[in-house]
């Protein structure tokens, strides 16, 4: 493609409202342009990258045996009312009415539509399993769209839905989708992890998220430094320490702590090591529990895990922290002075707390703490559970290595849905005995447009984007120097351009006649992996200058061998 026919819209300055590097670079490189909050137009340059991701996704989905279709983006309310999600979904569901005042929504997902399709089209167990997918624009009315296409309101998504006679069949397809996703993100050139995840509002029995590792990621993920274990921090098990509880070394004593309202205050003012302190958090108890409130105890340097906490049978779900008024009414002290000694409400302690000795905690009297508390001597050990978020250095739950914590950008999510939608909507087939059987479902999503942003977050430098080979809008940039002043150079550059095209390279031929610095800056900003620079001196020597986007130095390459040289470099990149 000639630059004179493919105008670049690069920017020198970073837009003030762009918070993350991918948003900044996509705007500066001229890949996207904002239309309204959370709505972006993809320019020809950006669309080339988007289509690359889409092509890889389609290739691997087809390879895995999925069938592509296309469903309407606008969905009738009746389907969502059947599934129960019309009432459950919040304001992120864009609802609308047609001229006949019939209610619709702009689909954020398509579970209802595909289930309706299957209950009409699939009648026998012989037609199963089947896996349908589409690549389509979705809309979610995010309360605060941000980070460019990373969290836009309108986005391109690949969503797939599989249907089965039983759980075993679902697990087979789920495993194939896991493998397909692994191939997709590997081919995209991304450093990613597949992590155990919560099924969330979509529901189901098992779930994995695929996260691209990046400092700007919104999710914290924990993974082993030895094995393939990985999980969202919220779901990673905090393994109980292998050590035994140390014997008591101090007497329990009541200490005046009038200004210690937080763990940090306690550490700073009274010299306790933070790992020798305990936080007491009071939450609403489950309906029918022995008391309306229950206390959860974690070590002072640990954080309560809300997902783990609300899965306890004693705790109300969703998790609700007690108000100060409720706490004072039940305990007689404020939140900064709570602890397990003489606590008048039930409590559960974290595994790490159960192994503590000589620790400090609130005395359930305002402005007072007990120091030197020991289980079994000063009070009985309450029920023990895994209540906390894991931290870096914790043992991996699979027994192999230690956990590392990194930020991740979720780009894919796969679910074993079970029968949630098929039961609600009556999606059945006839089994071998001619009896009606409710089908079992799986669903599998990839944020196609989000992959583009995630790739940039992971692949950039001070000059701009560094595209992985498979995602680059063009693979080779051809930059003639001062070609407007030399017909000989123009003809040589034109001839090389044709050679490159005929050899199958995706070439961006910068024939704009810009000065070299401006031309090189644009090529680095938009991230083309391979740059060829042709000048009069090189032409005389039968050479061309080569520089890879990740290289610090240039290389002189013989003009007649440049095609083979490029092929070698590209093969090495894979």
Swiss-Prot record:
Which GO molecular function annotation, any one, does this entry have?
A: ATP binding
**Annotated InterPro entries:** aa-tRNA-synt_IIb (IPR002314), aa-tRNA-synth_II (IPR006195), aa-tRNA-synth_II/BPL/LPL (IPR045864), Anticodon-bd (IPR004154), Anticodon-bd_dom_sf (IPR036621), Pro-tRNA-ligase_IIa (IPR002316), Pro-tRNA-synth_IIa_bac-type (IPR004500), Pro-tRNA-Synthase_IIa_type1 (IPR023717)
Q: What is its EC number?
A: 6.1.1.15
> Biological process (GO) annotations?
prolyl-tRNA aminoacylation
The protein's location, in the record's own words, is: Cytoplasm
Which keywords appear in this protein's UniProt record, sorted alphabetically?
A: Aminoacyl-tRNA synthetase, ATP-binding, Cytoplasm, Ligase, Nucleotide-binding, Protein biosynthesis
Q: Nucleus: is it a keyword of this entry?
A: no
List the catalysed reactions.
Answer: tRNA(Pro) + L-proline + ATP = L-prolyl-tRNA(Pro) + AMP + diphosphate
Q: Does the keyword ATP-binding apply?
A: yes
Lineage: superkingdom: Bacteria
Q: Which Pfam families match?
A: HGTP_anticodon, tRNA-synt_2b, tRNA_edit
Task: Provide the Gene Ontology terms for cellular component.
Answer: cytosol
Predominantly, its location class is cytoplasm
Q: What is known of its domains?
A: Consists of three domains: the N-terminal catalytic domain, the editing domain and the C-terminal anticodon-binding domain.
Q: Which NCBIfam families match?
A: PRK09194.1, proS_fam_II
Record family assignment: Belongs to the class-II aminoacyl-tRNA synthetase family. ProS type 1 subfamily.
Subunit structure and binding partners: Homodimer.
Which function does this protein serve? Catalyzes the attachment of proline to tRNA(Pro) in a two-step reaction: proline is first activated by ATP to form Pro-AMP and then transferred to the acceptor end of tRNA(Pro). As ProRS can inadvertently accommodate and process non-cognate amino acids such as alanine and cysteine, to avoid such errors it has two additional distinct editing activities against alanine. One activity is designated as 'pretransfer' editing and involves the tRNA(Pro)-independent hydrolysis of activated Ala-AMP.
Q: Which PANTHER family match?
A: MITOCHONDRIAL RIBOSOME PROTEIN L39/PROLYL-TRNA LIGASE FAMILY MEMBER (PTHR42753), PROLINE--TRNA LIGASE (PTHR42753:SF2)
Which protein is depicted?
A: Proline--tRNA ligase
**Which source organism?**
Thioalkalivibrio sulfidiphilus (strain HL-EbGR7)
The taxonomy runs:
Bacteria, Pseudomonadati, Pseudomonadota, Gammaproteobacteria, Chromatiales
């Amino acid at each position: 493609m000639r630059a004179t026919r493919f105008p670049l819209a690069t920017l020198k300055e970073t837009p003030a409202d762009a918070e993350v590097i991918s948003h900044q670079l996509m705007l500066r490189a001229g890949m996207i342009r904002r239309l309204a909050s959370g709505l972006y137009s993809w320019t020809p340059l950006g669309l080339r990258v988007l289509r690359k991701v889409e092509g890889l996704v389609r290739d691997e989905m087809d390879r895995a045996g999925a069938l592509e279709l296309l469903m309407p983006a606008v969905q009738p309310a009746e389907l969502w009312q059947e599934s129960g999600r019309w009432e459950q979904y919040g304001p992120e569901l864009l609802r609308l009415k047609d001229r006949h005042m019939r209610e619709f929504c702009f689909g954020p997902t398509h579970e209802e539509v595909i289930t309706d399709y299957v209950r009409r089209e699939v009648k026998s167990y012989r037609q199963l399993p089947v896996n349908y997918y589409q690549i389509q624009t979705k809309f979610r009315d995010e309360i605060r769209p941000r980070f460019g296409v990373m969290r836009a309101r309108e986005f391109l998504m690949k969503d797939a839905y599989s249907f089965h006679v039983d759980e075993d069949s679902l697990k087979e397809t789920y495993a194939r989708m896991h493998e397909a996703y692994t191939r997709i993100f590997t081919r995209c050139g991304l450093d990613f992890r597949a992590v155990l995840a919560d099924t969330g509002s979509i529901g189901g029995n098992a779930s994995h998220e695929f996260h691209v590792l990046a400092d700007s990621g919104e999710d914290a993920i924990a993974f082993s430094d030895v094995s393939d274990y990985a999980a969202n921090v919220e779901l990673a098990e905090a393994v109980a320490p292998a050590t035994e509880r140390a014997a008591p070394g101090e007497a329990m004593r009541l200490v005046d702590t009038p200004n210690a309202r937080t763990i940090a205050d306690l550490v700073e003012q009274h010299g306790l090591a933070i790992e020798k302190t305990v936080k007491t958090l009071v939450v609403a108890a489950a309906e029918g529990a022995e008391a309306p409130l229950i206390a959860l105890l974690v070590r002072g340097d640990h954080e309560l895990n809300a997902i783990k906490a609300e899965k306890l049978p004693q705790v109300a779900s969703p998790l609700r922290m007690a108000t100060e008024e409720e706490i004072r009414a039940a305990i007689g002290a404020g939140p900064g002075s709570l602890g397990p000694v003489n606590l008048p409400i039930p409590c559960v302690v974290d595994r790490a707390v159960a192994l503590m000795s000589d620790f400090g905690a609130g005395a359930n009297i305002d402005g007072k703490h007990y120091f030197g508390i020991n289980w079994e001597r000063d009070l009985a050990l309450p029920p023990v559970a895994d209540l906390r978020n894991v931290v870096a250095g914790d043992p991996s739950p699979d027994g192999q290595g230690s956990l590392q914590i990194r930020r991740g950008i979720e780009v894919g999510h796969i679910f074993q849905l079970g029968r949630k939608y098929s039961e609600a909507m009556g999606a059945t087939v006839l089994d071998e005995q001619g009896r009606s059987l409710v089908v079992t479902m799986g669903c599998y999503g990839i944020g196609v447009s989000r992959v583009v942003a995630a790739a940039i977050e992971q692949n950039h430098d001070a000059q701009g984007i560094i595209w992985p080979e498979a995602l680059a809008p063009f693979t080779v940039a051809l930059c003639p120097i001062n070609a407007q002043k030399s017909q000989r150079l123009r003809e040589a550059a034109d001839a090389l351009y044709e050679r490159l095209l005929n050899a199958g390279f995706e070439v961006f031929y910068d024939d704009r006649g810009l000065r070299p610095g401006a031309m090189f800056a644009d090529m680095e900003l938009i991230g083309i992996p391979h740059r060829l620079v042709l000048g009069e001196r090189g032409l005389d020597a039968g050479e061309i200058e080569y520089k890879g986007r990740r290289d610090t130095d240039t290389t002189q390459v013989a003009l007649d061998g440049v095609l083979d040289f490029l092929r070698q470099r590209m093969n090495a990149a894979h």
